[in-house]
Amino acid sequence: MKQLRIPAVFMRGGTSNAVVLHERDLPRDRAQWDEIFLAAIGSPDPYGRQLDGMGGGISSLSKVCVVGPSTRPDADIDYTFAQVQVKEAKVDYSGNCGNMSSAMGPFAVDEGLVKVSGKEALVRIHNTNTRKIIHARFALDDGKAAVDG
């Protein structure tokens, strides 16, 4: 694959880490996403180390999240979760990751996708994998997510 330049944020959510991308920066054809995600994470890696990418060699460190404007009136953002296999060239979109779901509200606020004010934010997240709405409530510090750790 030819090297691409795609803006990304490497973000922690609970015990997981993920490469987080804006949907606007990815090809409209989702069939092209797998190749990009595999390259970004460093899969497949028969040795299970993912040294050529941002993955950490275990499933909790081999994730990609895509965030964009909501397609539903009852949500602020859409969030698509991708679990990238470590040793195989496979990307699974069938589930969700609760740990990374907790990071999508702060990501949306910090990236300016959701406007907030005050000391607390509530971001309504539409998980496109499960078609569920997740409410993320978190503290703010000067208009950004207040994050420790």
Report residues per predicted region:
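A glycine-rich beta-to-alpha transition motif near the start of alpha/beta enzyme domains, typified by
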Residues: 1-149
